[in-house]
């Protein structure tokens, strides 16, 4: 019984810690995206995203790219009202495929309301150390389901605790900052 309770407590703590680590590296991506140097505007979400799409088409004119938009959930709710949409989740990101026929929309409260962001999926880069490689072996880490966060536990008999070490070496960034467009929804 004690082992089950202990394992459950450790597992729940791990999940919360991993979520915090993932939120940190996602937050750093949003910070970089918010610093996009190009702009577009519209009176509502659909017009703003359409104008962002047009800017992407011009910027990436000679390239075959897939647009991706980052949108605040309140903007999506205000626009859609009671419409039926299907949201999906991968690596902690909530997204809608083919949103308004323009591309993938990632929905996050870390995006400022009325300030959607657009770039090409191909402009997004990631650098990371896999948590199943040499570093992980050195510290005896077990990778989470994404492979981006590693963890290990050690017991401390002096104060009867279980310490958890989490390690993550992840950085997401746009390759071209001027290929990131920040929209403004001005209202009607």
Predicted regions and their residues:
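Unusually extended, aromatic-enriched hydrophobic runs near protein termini
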Residues: 24-44, 111-126
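Short low-complexity stretches enriched in small and charged residues
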Residues: 1, 20-27, 82-90, 117-119
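Extended, solvent-exposed, turn-rich assembly/linker loops in the middle of proteins
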Residues: 35-105
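Alpha-helix initiation/capping motif
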Residues: 1, 5, 62, 72, ...
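Long, contiguous amphipathic alpha-helices that act as assembly "spine/axial" helices in icosahedral shell
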Residues: 1-41, 159-168
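Sequence/fold signature of self-assembling virion shell proteins
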Residues: 90-188
């Amino acid at each position: 019984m004690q082992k089950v309770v202990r394992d459950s407590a450790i597992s729940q703590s791990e999940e919360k810690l991993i979520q915090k680590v993932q939120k940190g590296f996602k937050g750093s991506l949003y910070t970089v995206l918010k610093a996009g140097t190009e702009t577009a505007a519209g009176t509502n979400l659909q017009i703003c995203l359409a104008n962002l799409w047009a800017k992407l088409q011009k910027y990436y004119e000679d390239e075959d790219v897939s647009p991706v938009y980052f949108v605040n959930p309140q903007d999506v709710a205000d626009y859609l009202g009671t419409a039926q949409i299907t949201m999906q989740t991968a690596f902690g990101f909530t997204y809608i495929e083919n949103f308004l026929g323009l591309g993938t929309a990632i929905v996050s409260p870390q995006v400022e309301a009325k300030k959607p962001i657009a770039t090409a999926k191909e402009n997004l880069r990631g650098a990371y150390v896999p948590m199943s490689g040499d570093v992980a072996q050195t510290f005896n880490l077990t990778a989470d389901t994404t492979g981006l966060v590693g963890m290990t536990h050690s017991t401390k008999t002096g104060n009867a605790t279980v310490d958890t070490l989490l390690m993550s070496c992840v950085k997401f960034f746009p390759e071209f900052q001027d290929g990131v467009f920040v929209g403004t929804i001005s209202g009607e």
